[in-house]
Amino acid sequence: EMCIRDRPRFGLGADILMGFPGETEAHVLETLEVVRSLPLTYAHVFPYSARPGTVAAELPDQVGKAVRQERAARVRAGVEAKREAFWKDTLTCERLLVALDCNEDAGSASGQHGVDECYVPCRLRTPLRGEGHTLIPVRPVSVSRKGVIVEPVRP
């Protein structure tokens, strides 16, 4: 809550393990509620898999593989919805700083790309020459499946 209060545009990442032995549907619903309540913009959600010789592999109430995968998919969908909303909210920002991580040719189909200060993937609508590996002030213009499309802001 303090982070959100101090930085209203705040994104959070997490690793989420689903299907650990003993996990119930109530646990899944609780996890989904946590996902809804946090400003998650990224999560690595993965199903538990038993590793021979570990304590967890010997625990009772092992969750079946199909159930583990289904639960992980539900949580991924919840995180995806949060991420999409966060990316769309980025369009309300007047200005972002993007750290460019490549300097491709201006004619490249993928253009220059990087991340903003909240690690939102961004792609320059019109690539700039000689602007690789640097911070660029930009204005968000639209959202794509892969992130936010931006254009440079000149002082």
Mark where each language-model region is.
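Hydrophobic faces of well-ordered beta-strands that scaffold small-molecule active sites
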Residues: 12-18, 44-45
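Short loop/turn motifs enriched for small/polar and acidic residues
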Residues: 17-19, 48, 101-103
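Terminal RNA-binding accessory module
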Residues: 58-155
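Non-cysteine beta-strand/loop elements that form the S-adenosyl-L-methionine
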Residues: 39-49
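Short, charge-patterned binding micro-sites
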Residues: 48-56
